[in-house]
């Protein structure tokens, strides 16, 4: 009968085995004690001895049941169980004295001491041996892990691990030399350089990061070092969850790209965050999108009087409205959240909303941002990105709005695709309106690159492909991109908007560009898998190069020209841009509008080339309807 079969036995049967075992231990203890005074074997067989033993055994088992010694038969033995066994053995020794005196009427002082020592050793050692066997059995079934970080959070994680049978922690690892070579909660603390030895000795397959207070740079450095060990790396939540006591095994998550690419945030300046928001009516277009929804979260924290959520998608509007109301309930916020459906191309709808609610500030995040989708649907992209922005801006002027901030993109810089060119045209519209005489609305625009976790980002695509076993598809092995976290981008947009004087083009410092193929490799390795390539044909995940998509750039730029000026904020700059006065731009816009109505793709392209957008298309016309109509018959 193997251990699995024994563990599967009914609970009452396992209790019976322990009762029988303890009766045997009582007999052994009784025999050892009596052997000190019994000289001949026939005395052992006396009725008095058997009556004394039987009485002691029955009373002791009843006592053990009463003190709960059999409640945790198959569990690991705790100090409480061992204490109960010792206490029960002491009482049993007293019972031994009483029964011996009753049935034999003579008792040596050494007898109960010997009885107690033999019984307590027999009862507790069997349970400790069981604990060792079960621990070893469960450990073989569990995944051996290393906890990186022996501080308070690492210790909390260890306690959480002990509550489940999924992981077996074999060691702590910590960068602090002061606690290396110490033992914490029965686990030794090792130097990070000893990780290869631990992996080899114990077959470690996962490393759990418990360093929530580390800086982004420190996390990146640790994660890059761990990449060499081919183990899956998981991490606990941030400090907020730690403070709230929410650390548990289920809260462990895979290393996110934010951990790989994140940087130390610059604390937002309160006066800039609140300047256009606090005690004002704020409207966000595209409120249900990646950037729009984060803007709403940040704005809510700055306590406007009203927050207007303007969104075309009913479901997206429902989702962000529900989330914000739940946040308000938790925080006790009194901000009035107003969910409004509508299109940014409907100027009358926009104007009526802005006037009805006396809007002070508009953050215009509504746009079509996916390069291939706009390339395949050129007219809709231009109508939404160019004329949608123009409608919003003109409605803002009509309603006497104070501040209008356009969320732009790095793809507007020397664009090679229609999406980028349309966003540059949107910028030109705001620049022209800002330059109008006696303009009361302060227009500005903020450019930045890719945000981590946004819809259409490579990151969730790669995560899905890795989860499905690959391959990861990449358009070009040399493609690079700038990345920023969504919260940081939203905070910088708000602060840049407060710094604008009118017609400003702000550029956010995106840090260093990232080679996407390196990012893909990191994500594979940190998932505990291996890259499959010519050098490693037996790897797990292959990276396939599919070729650049229509309008896609290898490299992205954030600035036009060399006249870049710093601002008072270390991560916000301004760029000097070519612009057209409204009298000239309006003619181009009129022709562009006519071309859209007539579905004239050739004229659309020529107009985008004629305007000072820097548009250099790398592909022919990719609009799907146009291509269908122009197929050779």
Per-region residue spans from a language model:
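Signature of alpha-helical transmembrane segments in polytopic membrane proteins
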Residues: 1-141, 180-183, 205, 209, ...
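A solvent-exposed beta-alpha-beta segment
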Residues: 36-38, 130-244, 312-319, 326-329, ...
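Flexible, Lys/Arg-rich cytosolic regulatory linkers and terminal tails that connect or flank
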Residues: 192, 219-281, 397
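NAD(P)-cofactor binding segment of oxidoreductase domains
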Residues: 220-234, 306-313, 356, 376-403
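Conserved Rossmann-fold NAD(P)-dependent oxidoreductase catalytic core, especially the SDR/UDP-sugar
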Residues: 245, 364, 368-371, 376-428, ...
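Strand-loop microenvironment adjacent to phosphate/nucleotide-handling motifs in alpha/beta enzyme folds
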Residues: 267, 272-276, 432-633
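N-terminal Rossmann NAD(P)H-binding glycine-rich loop of SDR-like oxidoreductase domains
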Residues: 282-298
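Conserved Rossmann-fold cofactor-binding substructure of NAD(P)-dependent oxidoreductases
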Residues: 341-361
């Amino acid at each position: 009968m193997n251990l699995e079969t024994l563990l599967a036995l009914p609970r009452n049967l396992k209790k019976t085995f322990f009762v029988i075992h303890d009766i045997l231990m009582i007999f052994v203890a009784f025999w050892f004690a009596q052997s000190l005074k019994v000289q001949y074997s026939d005395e052992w067989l006396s009725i008095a001895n058997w009556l004394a033993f039987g009485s002691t055994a029955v009373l002791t088992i009843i006592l053990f049941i009463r003190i709960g010694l059999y409640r945790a038969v198959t569990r690991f033995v705790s100090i409480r169980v061992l204490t109960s066994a010792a206490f029960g053995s002491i009482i049993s020794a007293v019972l031994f004295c009483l029964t011996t005196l009753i049935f034999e009427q003579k008792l040596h002082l050494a007898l109960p001491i010997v009885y107690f020592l033999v019984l307590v050793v027999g009862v507790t050692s069997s349970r400790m041996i069981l604990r060792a066997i079960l621990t070893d059995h469960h450990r073989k079934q569990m995944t051996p892990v290393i906890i990186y970080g022996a501080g308070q959070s690492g210790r909390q994680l260890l306690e959480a691990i002990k509550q489940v049978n999924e992981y077996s922690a074999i060691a702590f690892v910590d960068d602090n030399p002061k606690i290396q070579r110490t033992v914490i909660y029965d686990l030794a603390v090792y130097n990070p350089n000893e990780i290869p030895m631990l992996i080899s000795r114990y077959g470690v397959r996962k490393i759990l990061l418990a360093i929530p207070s580390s800086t982004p740079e420190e996390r990146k450095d640790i994660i890059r070092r761990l990449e060499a060990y081919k183990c899956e790396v998981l991490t606990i939540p941030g400090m907020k969850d730690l403070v709230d006591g929410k650390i548990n095994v289920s809260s462990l998550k895979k290393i996110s790209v934010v951990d790989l690419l994140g940087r130390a945030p610059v604390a937002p300046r309160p006066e800039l965050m609140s300047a256009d928001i606090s005690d004002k009516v704020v409207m966000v277009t595209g409120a249900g999108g990646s950037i729009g929804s984060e803007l709403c979260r940040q704005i809510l924290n700055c306590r406007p009087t009203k927050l207007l959520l303007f969104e075309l998608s009913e479901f997206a509007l429902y989702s962000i409205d529900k989330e914000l109301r739940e946040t308000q309930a938790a925080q006790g916020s009194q901000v009035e959240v107003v969910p409004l459906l509508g299109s940014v191309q409907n100027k009358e709808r926009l104007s009526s909303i802005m006037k009805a609610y006396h809007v002070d500030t508009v953050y215009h995040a509504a746009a079509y941002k996916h390069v291939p989708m706009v390339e395949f649907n050129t007219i809709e992209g231009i109508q939404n990105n160019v004329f949608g922005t123009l409608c919003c801006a003109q409605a803002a002027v009509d309603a006497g709005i104070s501040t209008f901030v356009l969320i732009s993109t790095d793809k507007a810089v020397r664009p090679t695709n229609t999406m980028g060119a349309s966003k540059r045209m949107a910028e030109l519209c705001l620049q022209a309106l800002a330059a109008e005489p006696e303009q009361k609305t302060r227009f500005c625009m903020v450019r930045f690159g890719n945000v981590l976790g946004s819809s259409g980002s490579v990151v969730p695509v790669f995560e899905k492909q890795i989860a499905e076993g690959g391959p990861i598809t990449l358009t070009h092995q040399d493609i690079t991109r700038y990345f920023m976290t969504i919260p940081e981008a939203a905070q910088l947009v708000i602060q840049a908007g407060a710094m604008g004087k009118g017609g400003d083009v702000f550029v956010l410092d995106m840090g260093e560009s990232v080679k996407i193929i390196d990012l893909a490799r990191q994500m594979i390795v940190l998932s505990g898998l291996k890259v499959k390539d010519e050098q490693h044909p037996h790897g797990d995940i292959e990276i396939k190069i599919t070729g650049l998509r229509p309008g896609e750039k290898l490299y992205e730029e954030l600035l036009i020209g060399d006249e870049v000026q710093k601002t008072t904020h270390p991560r916000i700059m301004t760029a000097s841009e070519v612009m057209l006065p409204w009298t000239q731009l309006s003619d181009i816009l009129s022709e562009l509008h006519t071309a859209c109505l007539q579905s004239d793709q050739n004229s659309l392209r020529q107009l985008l080339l004629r305007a000072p957008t820097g548009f250099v298309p790398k592909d022919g016309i990719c609009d799907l309807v146009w291509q269908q109509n122009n197929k050779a018959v």
